[in-house]
């Protein structure tokens, strides 16, 4: 996993509350276990019409929002079933930061495990941030827990454990590998033959 220290990017805004994992990525696209290739199905039922043409009224389809790497959204994002495909789709689409009023617990952890930073922010701050010009770069500084635009500065908090994992690019496997020697020593001690 790539370390996450400072991220600069533009934002897309989807201020709906209670966006569940079925809306993030519909069930018909969950037949694969690879982590890539899901971005094209992100918010599929909202992004496309019945003829697979882009819905011009969906915020992520606005030309000025294409390429956004920060998603500003409503409360209780990622609720519903706990499929990891939802964070895979968001990451594959290009999002690195998700800002919401709150997250479903398992979805929140899955974001972190996949190198994305989920930030909990109150509605007034999100609405202020959502007014940022579509072309303006927003800077997210994880180490100092600060987000800045050309005109505003926002503070956010994150649990120390998750912060350290993201800053150092550590996933569960790389953390386990830090103890490889201890694991081998233990296996030698308890070997049955």
Swiss-Prot record:
Enzyme Commission (EC) number: 4.2.1.33
Gene Ontology BP annotations: L-leucine biosynthetic process
Top-rank lineage group of the source organism: Bacteria
Enzymatic class: lyase
Keywords on record: Amino-acid biosynthesis, Branched-chain amino acid biosynthesis, Leucine biosynthesis, Lyase
HAMAP family: LeuD_type1
Database matches in CDD domains: IPMI_Swivel
Annotated catalysed reactions: (2R,3S)-3-isopropylmalate = (2S)-2-isopropylmalate
Record's function text: Catalyzes the isomerization between 2-isopropylmalate and 3-isopropylmalate, via the formation of 2-isopropylmaleate.
Assembly, per entry: Heterodimer of LeuC and LeuD.
Pathway: Amino-acid biosynthesis; L-leucine biosynthesis; L-leucine from 3-methyl-2-oxobutanoate: step 2/4
GO cellular component: 3-isopropylmalate dehydratase complex
SUPFAM superfamilies: LeuD/IlvD-like
One Pfam family hit: Aconitase_C
Gene Ontology terms for molecular function: 3-isopropylmalate dehydratase activity
InterPro entries (alphabetical): 3-IsopropMal_deHydase_ssu, Aconitase/3IPM_dehydase_swvl, AconitaseA/IPMdHydase_ssu_swvl, IPMI_Swivel, LeuD
Family label: Belongs to the LeuD family. LeuD type 1 subfamily.
Name by which UniProt lists this protein: 3-isopropylmalate dehydratase small subunit
């Amino acid at each position: 996993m790539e370390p996450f220290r400072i991220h600069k990017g533009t934002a897309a805004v989807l201020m709906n509350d209670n966006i569940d994992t079925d809306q993030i990525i519909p069930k018909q696209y969950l037949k694969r276990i690879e982590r890539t290739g899901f971005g094209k199905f992100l918010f599929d039922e909202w992004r496309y019409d019945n003829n697979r043409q882009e819905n011009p009224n969906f915020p992520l389809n606005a030309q000025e929002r294409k390429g956004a790497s920060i998603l500003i959204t409503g409360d209780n994002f990622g609720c519903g079933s706990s499929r990891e495909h939802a964070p895979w789709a968001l990451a594959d689409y290009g999002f690195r930061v998700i800002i919401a009023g709150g997250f479903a617990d398992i979805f929140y952890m899955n974001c972190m495990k996949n190198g994305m930073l989920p930030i909990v922010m109150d509605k007034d701050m999100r609405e202020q941030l959502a007014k940022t010009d579509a072309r303006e770069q927003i800077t997210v500084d994880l180490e100092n827990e600060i987000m800045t635009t050309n005109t505003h500065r926002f503070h956010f908090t994150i649990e120390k454990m998750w912060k350290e994992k993201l800053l150092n690019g550590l996933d569960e496997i790389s953390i386990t590998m830090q103890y490889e020697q201890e694991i081998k020593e233990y296996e030698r001690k308890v070997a049955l033959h």
